[in-house]
Amino acid sequence: MKKYLKKSKLIRQAHKHVVHNKAKLLRTLDSFKKPNNASAWEEYINFALNNQLDKTNFVPFSNQKYSGKSSKKIIAYYLPQYYQIKQNDEWFGRGFTEWSNVTKAVPQFSGHWQPHLPIDVGFYNLETTKIMHRQVELAKTYGISGFCFYYYWFSGGEKIMEKPINNWLKDKDLDFPFMLFWANEDWTNTWGESADLGTKTYSAKMKKTDVEKFVKDILPFLSDKRYITIDGRPHIIIYQPIKDPYLPTFIKEIKNKIQQAGINKPFISLVFPDTFDEDFDPRNYGADGAVEFGAHLKTMPQEIKAQTTNEKIINPLAKLTEYDMEGYINSDQINPKTSYPLFKGAMTYFDNTARKIYTGAQLFEISPELYQKWLYKSLENSSTDQVFVTAWNEWAEGMHLEPDHKYGYAYLQATRNALENFENKK
């Protein structure tokens, strides 16, 4: 097992990062608004330059491997955007990956946790499965039962970022369950700060001619013995249930095609919509259930939302909204009642400053302790045996179970704590 980094070594590495990036950071800060209060500006500068050195809340690696046998399985969403693809090269410059956004982020106010920087796994490249073996080792150690890979498949059969999941399929030494999360939304270059780098759009609006192509592409995954199932039925998640009028027909047809291929009819879950529409029922789309993906933002009680003040944010161009997640997690909003199977979820943290600070970033400050509470409640209230965590490695949005400079392995440890506490209560 790869030896984890000790605090002293982490501090030295963090110090190197601070020194290396000091000039770059100061150039960035020159464009920020300096408060009238000189001491506030000095406080911010000191924080921005030294926040990676603070190991107050750092949790080290645990050699004790999870050995429980819970009735609930925790599955973490997995982002594959950690290698070069031609679309990102064309739109954002050669060599662009998720790490390009992660490393450019800076704090927007004193106390703002940015950037999020990985330890243990480092700034990995998913061109090969080398780092995946370490990811599996970490996941198993802390009680995670599987990865749910985002799968980018578009009308006409075009695919993006498919190499990691294809490599996973080929590497049979990766003895760990997995499944597909079909990210069926149009894909353009506009998710970043710029919208003028290209015009190519990959459409997720399905047509009848897409059915056979889609089924042909996913059959190798569904037939793999590691694929996650529900009562023997391969589980597939679909992201956007309400934006494609053809989707109900598409779901019905792919179910039939998959069954005709000799595989059990898939269990299809739709992402529970942010609108939290009480009339929403996945069965109306031909699906079997729904899955939670983060927080139900649009119906979050107004008192839980908190717009950051101009006095707090140093960057005059920043657009950032904070949410009181403790209030949300303690509210009834976290446990909606449905007549259909709803796969509960929890979120580690969320801060998409690295991607959206000038177009409307959101900040959900969720400490490891608060995340543990949320996950425990999801385990306790779930009527299904699968609970989903957002996310394993969405670093540019601050959602990562993977260890980081600030908290170390705290979110992984919180995952195991929640699972063990749930087991011990039964």
Task: Outline where the language-model segments fall.
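Membrane-proximal basic amphipathic "stem/tether" segments
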Residues: 1-54
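Glycan-processing catalytic domains of CAZymes
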Residues: 33-426
